[in-house]
Design a protein with these regions (language model features):
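Accessory alpha-helical/coil subdomains and C-terminal extensions
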Residues: 1-114
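C-terminal non-catalytic interaction/assembly regions of soluble proteins
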Residues: 94-173
Length: 173
C-alpha cells in the first residue's frame, strides 16, 4: 500500500487496491491502516458509491491530488449484495473484480481523479518475512511442542509482555 500511495501521489491519481479476504475484512482493514489508505471498504460495513465520492471530494478540498482506496474482495452494497459479476455452478458469487467494478462506477460519476486498479491477490501471501517474524514463528513452534510434550492441549501460543506464553482457548474466545 505504501508503494501505491507513492505512485498515486507522483501521478495525481486515485489508486484502488483490491485485497483478498472473502467475507472478512480484516486483511483489507489492517492493510489500509498500515498503509495509511484514505478509504477502506470491508464486507462488514456496507458502502455506497456516493459515500466514496464524498470522501474523495473531501480529499480534493484539502488540496490533495491523490488518494488510496483499499477494498476487500467481498464488499457488500447497502442492500447486502456481494459485488460480483460472476456466479459459480451453484449460483454463489465468485469473488474478485470488485476493484475494477468500483473504478468504472466511480469514474462515471466523478472525474476529478484518474483511477487505477491494482489487485494484490495471492501476492499478499508471498511477502518476505522480516527477522522478527521468523524468530517469533520459531519461538511459537517451540512453545507449541513444549505444551504437547507436557500433555497440554486446548491452548493458544501468544506473545505477551515480551515473552511467549500460552492461554486456554476458551479465554481467547
Amino acid at each position: 500500500i505504501d508503494s501505491l500511495e507513492l505512485t498515486a501521489r507522483s501521478h495525481n491519481r486515485a489508486m484502488i487496491t483490491e485485497v483478498m479476504g472473502r467475507d472478512a475484512g480484516h486483511l483489507a482493514l489492517h492493510s489500509a491502516l498500515a498503509g495509511k489508505a484514505d478509504v477502506c471498504l470491508i464486507p462488514e460495513i456496507p458502502y455506497t458509491i456516493d459515500g466514496i465520492i464524498a470522501k474523495l471530494k473531501e480529499i480534493k478540498a484539502r488540496g490533495r491530488n491523490h488518494a488510496v482506496i483499499v477494498v476487500s474482495e467481498g464488499i457488500k452494497t447497502e442492500d447486502g449484495q456481494v459485488v460480483s459479476s460472476a456466479k459459480n455452478m451453484v449460483g454463489e458469487a465468485v469473488y474478485g473484480g470488485v476493484g475494477q467494478y468500483l473504478c468504472n462506477e466511480i469514474s462515471k460519476r466523478y472525474g476529478d481523479f484518474q483511477f487505477r486498479v491494482t489487485t494484490l491477490g495471492h501476492l499478499q501471501r508471498s511477502g518476505v518475512p522480516v527477522a522478527f517474524d521468523r524468530l517469533l514463528a520459531s519461538l511459537f513452534g517451540a512453545k507449541a511442542i513444549e505444551l504437547l510434550d507436557q500433555g497440554e492441549d486446548n491452548k493458544m501460543v501468544i506473545w505477551k509482555d515480551g515473552e511467549v506464553s500460552a492461554v486456554k482457548l476458551p479465554d481467547v474466545v
